Regions:
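Nucleotidyltransferase catalytic core that binds NTPs
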Residues: 1-221
């Protein structure tokens, strides 16, 4: 069985997150993808994100009646910062023994993975799916695969080479690193927060129930 771990702040969750998750699920034939809100993201400053309970509730509303996508509270139940290596180890201990677990992250996040706690262990333990949206800010001058190629050679080393046959980067003693292009929806949590603060509509950027919750709670004002 194949499972995906898709972590993030989800501040708030939006249709870009959900569409990317669905496309990855179908593209890699995953049984289920767990969307995992971070309680205290190590790379975020206090006050930059709303309460974890609110972000969790928005995710639950967004995923109502969505087969194959579910919310995990594992990082919210952990004290201290949320580190991906700890989350991976948790799922390895609770999912069926022969499961393949994929770590799903955006291209921008992956290009900073060498700053993560125990990132070398991640590269050894789990295959990674790097989501690339065509025409993203960092993709204007170079295509996603070119950025990835430069980064792997300059920052991660390890002898990664791109396999045309398997459409991923391979290295001895490391798990594969896949680049997966998803539909380029021009939606970001930053933009949504800005629109809410300006009193403008966020319709069709987030699920309807999520938008209603944001307004009812007075979030991002």
């Amino acid at each position: 069985m194949r499972f995906g771990l898709f972590g993030g702040t989800f501040n708030p969750v939006h249709l870009g997150h959900l569409r990317a998750a669905l496309e990855v699920k179908e593209g890699f034939e995953l049984e289920e993808i767990f969307l995992i809100p971070a309680a205290l993201p190590p790379h975020k400053l206090p006050g930059e994100v709303v309460d974890a309970g609110d972000r969790l509730h928005m995710l639950n509303l967004a995923l109502e009646n969505t087969a194959g996508l579910s919310v995990s509270e594992v990082e919210l139940q952990r004290s201290g910062p949320s580190y991906t290596i700890d989350t991976v180890n948790h799922f390895k201990s609770v999912l069926p023994e022969k499961s393949t677990i994929y770590l799903i992250i955006g291209l921008d996040a992956f290009l900073e993975i060498d700053s993560w706690k125990s990132y070398q262990a991640l590269l050894l333990q789990v295959p990674i799916i790097v989501i690339n949206r065509p025409q993203t800010d960092r993709g204007l001058s170079k295509l996603g695969w070119e950025l990835m190629d430069d980064y792997l050679k300059s920052s991660l080393s390890g002898g990664y080479k791109f396999s045309e046959l398997q459409s991923c980067y391979l290295a001895a003693d490391r798990q594969p690193i896949h680049i997966f292009e998803v539909t380029a929806l021009d939606i970001s949590s930053t933009r949504i927060r800005s629109l809410v603060k300006k009193g403008r509509s966020i319709g069709y950027l987030v699920p309807r129930k999520t938008a209603k919750f944001i307004h009812s709670r007075g979030l991002y004002l």
